[in-house]
Amino acid sequence: MPTPPRVLLLLAKKRPADLEARIAAGEEPEVEYLALARRLGAEIVDFHSVEASSSRAVRWAARRLGLAWGLALLGAQRRREFAHLYATGEDVGIPLVMLLRALRWHERLTVVIHNADTPKRRRLLRALGHRAYHAVICLSAAQERVLVDTVGLPAAKVKRMRLWMDHRFYRPSRAAGENEAAGDYVLSIGMESRDYPTLQAAAAELPYRFHVVASGWSPTAGFTAAGGIQGGANITVERNLPYARLRELYDGCRLVVVPVKRVSYAAGVTGICEAMAMGKPVVASASPGILDYVEDGVSGRLVPVGDAGAMRGAIAALWDDPDGARAMGRHNRVWVEAEINTDAYVEQVARLLGSA
């Protein structure tokens, strides 16, 4: 096997000092950027690196323009040390493209773009062109269309991949035949672009217990808790749970509901994939950004965005059909093991950068 190229990985957040220890102890799932760094022989720079930089320009950019700009400038300054740059998101990727374009450093940046579909980002990405990129990774067909058809990037440079997640951490605690339809509550999770008022309206007319974890992806992420959902007679709301507790809730539920607004990016997909990894069927709003991940009638049920009646009916149908729910859960676990996992994503990126 050829030696992977040396890569500088730009992570647009602060990496916790004890993260690897917590992962090794089984307290948290593996994260894709650590797995990528191991596989590619990459060096990671993050917001801690910006704050510790000896470069006055980097520290000035961070103070005046924000940490993402400081990180982009740090990456641009160190570009000649590496065969390739990889940016984990558009928050650092777009500033980095601006700098690399000015420096005439072409074809050696790969960036993950989660959401290109805002007026400002469409204009910026269109104006910046494509020469800086080796590749642009997106996570849904809807985003691929935005990047190719609206922004105008060459289709050959836009690579649609599946979301990554740790399928070893998120796995059923019981044998497959015992787990999928055994729960006694409905679980809903997440914050990004959630439509909790629709779920609240659906739950109000159902006799089942609902457990809602209404906050961001991590207890240390610093996100504001999601609004639009209130505890009630059959609704329990929790926020900012440790990963082990979240996994317990997945394991004990009968099905998972992911109500989202109509958006073109993959809002809700992390929760959907975690639920699938745990062998659970999913009810989800048919938002364009998640249609790649839920096949109606096979992996779960898709309902029109904002339709509380349809959501209520889909939840009841799965609850009342344990055999069907069990089959969906088995299908979902198999699919995750085959395609929707960190190992698969890392190998795809390694092959992609191996052609740089």
What positions do the PLM features span?
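Nucleotide-activated donor-binding/catalytic signature segment of Leloir-type glycosyltransferases, i.e.
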Residues: 214, 222-248
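A short, well-ordered alpha-helix in the C-terminal region of glycosyltransferases
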Residues: 310, 317, 324-339, 345-351
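Acidic anion/phosphate-binding donor-loop and adjacent secondary structure
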Residues: 145, 165-183, 197, 221
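Conserved donor-binding/catalytic core segment of Leloir-type glycosyltransferases
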Residues: 178-211
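Nucleotide-sugar-dependent
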Residues: 244, 258-274, 287, 291-292
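Conserved acidic donor-binding segment of nucleotide-sugar-dependent glycosyltransferases
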Residues: 296-297, 301-308, 316-322
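Conserved donor-binding/catalytic loop of nucleotide-activated donor transferases
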Residues: 251-253, 273-281, 285-286, 296, ...
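Acidic donor-binding loop of glycosyltransferase active sites
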Residues: 250-265, 280
